Curated annotation (Swiss-Prot):
Protein name (record): Claudin-8
Keyword Protease assigned: no
Species of origin: Homo sapiens
Lineage, broadest ranks: Eukaryota, Metazoa, Chordata, Craniata, Vertebrata
Catalytic activity: chloride(in) = chloride(out); bromide(in) = bromide(out); iodide(out) = iodide(in); fluoride(in) = fluoride(out)
Residues in compartment: Cytoplasmic: 1-7, 103-117, 188-225
Cross-referenced Pfam families: PMP22_Claudin
Main location class: other
One example of a Gene Ontology biological process annotation: cell adhesion
Amino acid sequence: MATHALEIAGLFLGGVGMVGTVAVTVMPQWRVSAFIENNIVVFENFWEGLWMNCVRQANIRMQCKIYDSLLALSPDLQAARGLMCAASVMSFLAFMMAILGMKCTRCTGDNEKVKAHILLTAGIIFIITGMVVLIPVSWVANAIIRDFYNSIVNVAQKRELGEALYLGWTTALVLIVGGALFCCVFCCNEKSSSYRYSIPSHRTTQKSYHTGKKSPSVYSRSQYV
């Protein structure tokens, strides 16, 4: 019963992590305008993402434009685009594998050992996906903070951490926890299987011991008669 609850929790966290990974990938709020010094008065608000940048001026709705070329991105955003696309695919594969490894799923048969190994694989992929999400998010955040405190960079070009980065950190944590739960399910199944197989052997040993203990008694009586 405990392993079933862990499976449900792991699948839920994995699904949330998968949706969060896709959301972080498509969100344009990776870098947002920093309102400091002469830029305190809000005339323009800039968002920079992996696929587009958006500008909102005073009394004008936000306008977004897709990047004309990959080279228009900074190196950290270029790497982030590739890693986040890979993470989206990996999270989807891990989620589908987790569904196949659930005990309530019948399409993979009733072999619990096979399902346990499928869940273990899904858990490992979830953990790796969480690390893949964590790398570009932390990389971009480090670049933003470094430029923010760099006196050479113009104030108008300085940016702050966007909502996508905070969501990325949360998503990475959720994916890692979900994968860890699936690994715990595998460990619990292995322990229960080893315990289940050790009990009959112990009983058989006791039975053979009692049989061997009675046989000399029978033999001595027949010899006496």
